């Protein structure tokens, strides 16, 4: 009976391992999926900001218009990288975590089967003990009960050994996957933020280089010329704003506007749909990420 109790304790420990994996991996999957969705929403809001900056730039003088244009282009580039970040999180983090549902279900089925075999062994041993107490002289019945108990014990040993091997393989794979998934998560975030810092630095420098005094002088010259408060000085490079918006100069701005068009078509909830995965190393060598 001590052997039976020892095996039961062993199975309970393995069951706890699977239960904890089911609980925490499920929470990881849910939280990281929410993290990815919110990152996609942040990308969409930034796309809207880029669009508003473009519209605003078309109403301003050439100096400010050029500055805001370049600034918007940099923000659009960051959203390219953020789009790539979302795609990689889906492929490298969310999808592997989702696979654990099926693995845990199969392991639980193996545990349940092993427990049924153990319960049968306990019943056979209890039956044998009762026969020995009630009919100690009935050697035939006792012999049959001993045979059944021995057969049940062999089945239990075999089932327990199989379960130990199954849970051991499950635990090993779980540890490897845990390390790989979160390593990929950190790598994805580091690559995005490294690229974002690079582009944001360019955006900051664009704003620092903006000649506010020149723009203000141009504005004052125009307003004084209109209302006759003084002679307007000759202007250089102050052609009036074109009647149509300036063309989008980069693929980043074009892809931003394309995402805006998708949202207008009622597809704003599709930001977390999986797309073809782009290798992490590709992001490190490119200046802007794919979107569609």
Curated annotation (Swiss-Prot):
Q: List, in alphabetical order, the GO biological process terms annotated in this UniProt record.
A: cilium assembly
Compositional bias (Polar residues) at which positions?
138-153, 249-258
For this protein, the parts annotated as crossing the membrane are none
Top-rank lineage group of the source organism: Eukaryota
Q: Which CDD domains does this entry report, sorted A to Z?
A: BAR_FAM92
Q: Where is composition skewed (Acidic residues) in this entry?
A: 266-280
Q: Which UniProt keywords apply?
A: Cell projection, Cilium biogenesis/degradation, Cytoplasm, Cytoskeleton
The places in or outside the cell where this protein is found are: Cytoplasm, Cytoskeleton, Microtubule organizing center, Centrosome, Centriole; Cytoplasm, Cytoskeleton, Cilium basal body
Name the GO cellular-component terms: centriole; ciliary basal body; cytoplasm
Q: Where is this region: Disordered?
A: 131-153, 229-292
The protein's job, in short, is:
May play a role in ciliogenesis. In cooperation with CBY1 may facilitate ciliogenesis likely by the recruitment and fusion of endosomal vesicles at distal appendages during early stages of ciliogenesis.
What is known about its subunit structure? Homodimer (via BAR-like domain). Heterodimer (via BAR-like domain) with FAM92A. Interacts with CBY1.
Instruction: Please quote what the entry notes about the protein's domains.
Output: The BAR-like domain displays limited similarity to other BAR domains.
Q: Per its record, how is this protein called by name?
A: CBY1-interacting BAR domain-containing protein 2
Organism of origin:
Mus musculus
């Amino acid at each position: 009976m001590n052997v039976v109790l020892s095996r039961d304790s062993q199975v309970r420990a393995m069951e706890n391992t699977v239960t904890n994996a089911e609980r925490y991996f499920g929470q990881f999957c849910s939280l990281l999926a929410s993290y990815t969705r919110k990152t996609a929403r942040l990308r969409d809001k930034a796309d809207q900001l880029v669009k508003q900056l473009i519209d605003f730039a078309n109403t301003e003088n050439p100096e400010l218009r050029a500055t805001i244009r370049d600034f918007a282009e940099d923000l659009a580039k960051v959203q390219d990288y953020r789009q790539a970040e979302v795609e990689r999180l889906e492929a490298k983090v969310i999808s592997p975590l989702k696979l654990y549902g099926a693995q845990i279900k199969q392991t639980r089925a193996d545990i349940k089967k092993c427990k049924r075999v153990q319960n049968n062994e306990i019943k056979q041993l209890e039956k044998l003990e009762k026969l020995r107490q009630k009919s100690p002289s009935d050697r035939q019945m006792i012999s049959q009960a001993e045979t059944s108990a021995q057969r049940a014990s062999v089945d239990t040993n075999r089932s327990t050994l199989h379960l130990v091997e199954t849970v051991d393989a499950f635990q090993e794979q779980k540890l490897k996957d845990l390390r790989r998934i979160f390593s990929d998560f950190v790598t994805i975030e580091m690559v995005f933020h490294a690229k974002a810092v690079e582009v944001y630095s360019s955006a900051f420098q664009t704003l620092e280089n903006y000649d506010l005094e020149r723009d203000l002088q141009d504005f004052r010259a125009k307003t004084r010329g209109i209302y006759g408060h003084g002679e307007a000085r000759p202007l250089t490079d102050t052609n009036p704003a074109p009647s149509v918006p300036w063309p989008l100069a980069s693929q980043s701005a074009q892809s931003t506007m394309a995402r805006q068009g998708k949202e207008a078509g009622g597809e704003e909830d599709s930001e977390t749909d999986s797309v073809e995965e782009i290798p992490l190393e590709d992001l490190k060598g490119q200046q802007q990420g794919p979107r569609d």
